[in-house]
Amino acid sequence: MKYIIYAMAAMFFLASCSKDNDETGGGNGGGGETGGVTDVTPVTSDLTVNLTTDKACYKPGETVSFTADALPAGAKVRYRTLNKVISEQAVAGSSWTWTAPATDFTGYLADVYRTKEDGTEVILGTIAVDVSSDWTRFPRYGFVATFDASKTESKIQEEMAFLNRCHINGVQFQDWHNKHHWPLGGTREHLDAVYKDIANRDIYTQSVKDYIRIQHSFGMKAMFYNLCFGALDDAAGDGVKEEWYIFKGTGHTDKDAHTLPDSWKSNIYLLDPGNAEWQAYIAQRNDDVYANLDFDGYQIDQLGNRGDRYDYKGNKVNLPKTYVSFIEAMKGKHPDKRLVMNAVSSYGASQIAGTGKVDFLYNEVWGDEADFTDLYTILKANHQYGNQALKTVFAAYMNYEKGSGEFNMPGILLTDAVMFALGGSHLELGGDHMLCSEYFPNTRLQMSDALKTAVVRYYDFMTAYQNLLRDGGEEEKVLSLIHISEPTRL
């Protein structure tokens, strides 16, 4: 994409910034270098001020509240979009406000700085601001996956504050549900205070509610996860019919299933997403969810290419085609709720995008799409599938084969730099951990403090410069001066 090299270089610079004063400019040592067409003010950085905002994104005209941990006398803040300064003001104390401009779908960067006696500007801290009335225009997706007794209100507030600092504007709730065919813990009329998820972990309904409420207070949206075609082994007792399943053969005797450990509740048996009765059934179960939990939409999942599968009558099932009618049925039942559907290894991607009913595109990439060149291929295809209107989020599980310890920081940052520069974003940040597995509660790898700091800077860059990275533009061929003999892997 145009500017990819410059965008990646800028992100690497952000990650390498330190608290040491690193003078740039030089020259006459006065209030700025003169000569040529413009005056240039020398600038240096001393990133010692930590900044936060009260929300992950704002509507045009909304009040943005900033907080700083400490400010020196004479500090000022400057607001700019790309290279255009919008306004600036003096700041004192630890908090101040700014009215978001009227222009919608725009990224801004706030620089807090002071001016030295020689005229050099010292940047003390920076933070991005996203002014967008619809979060799906520039989705920055995170997740939560644990809802046990440890998730107190204060703990949830702390976790969501970090996601807010990274401008995460949508959060996927993974492994929150009771059963795939009956997601709500309890009934519409009577919720269970505690229930078991598929792995027999405790799920506290109040924790789920608290996550949603606190996310909304930060301006985030909450999306519940579920398969489009999953049922547990007790589904018949909950009204799921045998005729709704898909089978490995034409004789409707061997149900297709996703096998799970014996210690878990059940294997997951697969239904026909295109079956109208199943669609009506699960849409009603979703209605029970929406009636009790203030979710903003449904993150639909699938399991990729299953090979030849058959319905109860022995007809071959075209799964990508059934995804279309499933999405349309879900939107028809809840037109005001958002929908996103996973394209596992791009399976069904064109059909999903072609519905016109999903709000952005979501690709879970696996070994057959593990090169950086594959990310470009996916984004280019999605751009066509979505009529140049839908953004792409990648679910790419980092350091997948590493058993314990910390994430490989250079690998994380390189992957993010490539994804962001291409115009995508990366589902990787959770409330309490970074994602390393398709089983989202897996916490075997930890983020170092250095990685946490770098990630904040990367997400500031993606947000502040979203109009450069993710808002159209033309593709331009770039000649690389570096030859890589082997593909670069995620």
Explain the meaning of each model-derived region.
Residues Y3, L14-D46:
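Bacterial Sec-dependent N-terminal signal peptides
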